[in-house]
Design a protein with these regions (language model features):
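Amphipathic, non-transmembrane alpha-helical segments in extracytoplasmic/periplasmic proteins
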Residues: 58, 63-65, 120, 134-160, ...
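Short beta-strand-centered interaction patches in the first periplasmic/extracellular domains
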Residues: 2, 93, 110-127, 163-243
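Acidic, small/polar-enriched beta strand-loop surface segments
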Residues: 1-36, 186, 190, 207, ...
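Short amphipathic beta-strand and strand-loop transition segments with alternating hydrophobic
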Residues: 46-55, 103-109, 347-350
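Well-ordered beta-strand positions in beta-sheet-rich domains
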Residues: 94-99, 117, 260, 339-343, ...
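Extracellular/virion structural assembly segments
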Residues: 23, 33-80, 126-130, 139-142, ...
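Surface-exposed cap/loop segments at beta↔alpha junctions
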Residues: 2, 69-159, 366-367
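Oligomerization/assembly interface segments of phage tail-like spikes and tubes
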Residues: 52-71, 113-125, 188, 249, ...
Length: 367
């Protein structure tokens, strides 16, 4: 999550202001050029909304804006909204809410005037639309993150903070002409067991080694307390599917030795294990992995993510601007018997003071 200690205010001071009975919130809209350099502030955005979906295969973060300004170049300009929370001393604590590429707007003409409705997307769109002209080859011995950064730079995405690794490609890899650059990047990230590429609220490309939600500390807690910003209404759903209990993954390439990794659920307490079911359900797949260590980690990850049910919780809070992508939060709600960590799958934030922010959370229940 974004830091709550911003603009000279401490985390505790900002939390107190976020949880105050009365809050004063304003939104600003920063106009950027195609290099994310500031052009100025837009004073003609009358509203909009932002949504984030951590499981989306295209843009994770999308937005809608209503704009009356005619000075926007919708082909190249970008918008970075900011939420500003008024503090007790009269100053503001501010957070960026994403960098958005604009689509062609639709014009709406009414008696009160004309405005444009604009849909917008995070910078993953750049990497989806930019494709390789020829077969793209990365030679063996190339560092994975170096290869990824090279692709990002070639697409004009120069602000990136991919966690470094010492892993090298064990064999040359290639992708056919026309492959989106995002696909190549995520293939490389998957080979070293990193999370898919995403963009921060500030517009920086990010990825880090994958961690199970149980291994991650919550970024924030939503609790039903006296100063709670949590709505009293929420929904809970247990999404159950049949799952495998044995996973086999292989790496087979012409110029390297084959690799195999097997993971079997034999836990007697698990209702879907080979012991409990009395039969074996195999998930077999071919994957790309840098080495045996990476392959073992990938198979363990596949098994963990498959051997579970998802308890989905939908809740609403006051506007909380510090959420990023795929966060872990703690939810404490005694009336529903909830006190657990959840991964935030989706959130939506209206660009309107006093509105509610909706969160869709998932809790892993291993089976």
């Amino acid at each position: 999550m974004q830091s709550l200690a911003v603009d000279g205010y401490s985390r505790l001071a900002v939390i107190a202001a976020l949880h105050a009975t009365v809050r004063e919130t304003v939104f600003e809209y920063e106009l950027l050029d195609q290099n994310n350099e500031t052009l100025g502030l837009l004073d003609s955005v009358s509203g909009g909304s932002i949504k984030n979906n951590s499981l989306a295969t295209n843009a994770n973060r999308t937005a809608k804006f209503s704009i009356s300004d005619q000075g926007v170049n919708y082909l190249s300009d970008r918008i970075r909204p900011w939420m500003k929370l008024r503090m007790p001393d009269g100053g503001h604590a501010s957070w960026p809410l994403g960098v958005f590429i604009l689509s062609s707007p639709s014009r709406v003409i009414r008696s009160a005037g004309e405005h444009r409705k604009v849909e917008a997307y995070d910078q993953r769109l750049i990497l989806l639309e930019d494709r390789e002209e020829d077969r793209y080859v990365i030679t063996s011995g190339t560092n994975f993150v170096t290869a990824i950064n090279t692709i990002l730079d070639s697409a004009g995405v120069t602000e990136h903070a991919i966690i470094a690794t010492d892993k090298m490609l064990p064999a040359s890899r290639d992708w056919k002409a026309g492959t989106p650059k995002l696909r190549i990047i995520n293939d490389l990230l998957g080979s070293i067991n990193y999370s898919p590429l995403n963009f921060s609220s500030a517009g920086i490309a990010l990825s880090r080694p994958y961690q199970r939600p149980s291994e991650r500390a919550p970024g924030y807690e939503y609790a039903a307390t006296d100063d709670s910003i949590l709505s009293p209404d929420l929904s809970i759903e247990l999404d159950s599917f049949g799952v495998a209990n044995k996973w086999v993954a292989t790496v087979s390439e012409a110029d390297r030795l084959p690799l195999t990794s097997v993971y079997t659920n034999v836990e007697p307490s698990s209702p879907t294990s080979t012991v409990s079911r009395g039969r074996t359900i195999v998930d077999f797949r071919s994957v790309d992995a840098a080495d045996q260590e990476s392959l073992d980690a990938i198979v363990a990850r596949i098994a963990f993510e498959a051997s579970q049910l998802y308890e989905k919780v939908e809740l609403e809070t006051a506007l909380m601007p510090h959420h990023e992508n795929n966060e872990v939060v703690q939810v404490t709600y005694p009336r529903a018997g909830i006190s657990a960590k959840y991964t935030e799958h989706k959130w939506s934030l209206p660009l309107q003071a006093g509105a509610g922010m909706k969160h869709t959370l998932r809790r892993v229940v291993t089976v």
